[in-house]
Regions:
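Generic structural signal for helix capping and beta-alpha/helix-loop junctions
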Residues: 13, 57, 94-96, 125
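Internal, glycine-rich beta/alpha segment that forms the wall or movable "lid"
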Residues: 96-177
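Short, charge-rich binding segments
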Residues: 78-83, 108-110
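Hydrophobic faces of well-ordered beta-strands that scaffold small-molecule active sites
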Residues: 3-5, 48-50, 84-90, 113-119
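Active-site mouth loops of central-metabolism enzymes
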Residues: 15-31, 89-98, 136-142
Length: 177
């Protein structure tokens, strides 16, 4: 069993931000994220999870309107934690494998191997509008999963395209490759 903690602003309730003890800007407050991450790590949680979505509407939880995206906040949290896994959501429907592979590879290097990816396919068709697409251009469920499968193959291929010691940086010989 792996134990994970999700940092979700002030929570998943529509009115949680109104509670007297709530930190109303928690979804964009690095100090809050840092404290939560360090508490989770001290509590022996295995991983920290940052969810994300690409579409909001009138039914969305208010603090989802303004929140950190996972890669940046997890990279920052890597510098203030040392053991806890760092898992972020990223959609295969509205991103490119090369860029995402670089982002997660960077997070993995920054965190000394603690990166994880929650792969999603963005089910809400309104997401298309945020990427200059028409609603009808949003892929249906089977197509999103075909895209995701190919996307993961490409990402894994990019990550496995060189060995850890493939790059030579030898000061004595002057070889930098």
């Amino acid at each position: 069993i792996k134990l994970g903690a999700i940092i979700h602003g002030v929570g998943g309730n529509m009115s949680s931000w109104k509670h007297p003890d709530a930190i109303v800007d928690a979804s964009v407050n690095f100090k809050y994220y840092k404290e939560q991450a360090q508490k989770a790590e001290a509590g022996k949680f295995d991983l920290l999870f940052i969810a994300d979505g690409l579409y909001i509407n009138e039914k969305s939880i208010p603090h989802f309107l303004n929140r950190f995206e996972p890669i940046t906040i997890l990279s920052a949290l890597a510098s203030v934690t040392s053991k806890i896994g760092l898992v972020g959501t990223l959609s295969t429907s509205y991103s490119e494998p090369f860029t995402v592979s670089r982002q997660f590879s960077s997070l993995d290097h920054i965190s000394d191997g603690r990166a994880g990816w929650n792969v999603v396919t963005s089910p809400l068709e309104g997401s298309a509008l945020n990427f200059n697409k028409k609603l009808e251009e949003h892929p249906d469920h089977p197509k999103r999963y075909r895209i995701a499968s190919e996307y993961l193959q490409v990402s894994k291929g990019l990550w496995d395209s060189w060995e850890d010691d493939a790059f030579i940086r030898d000061k004595e010989t002057g070889v930098f490759f």
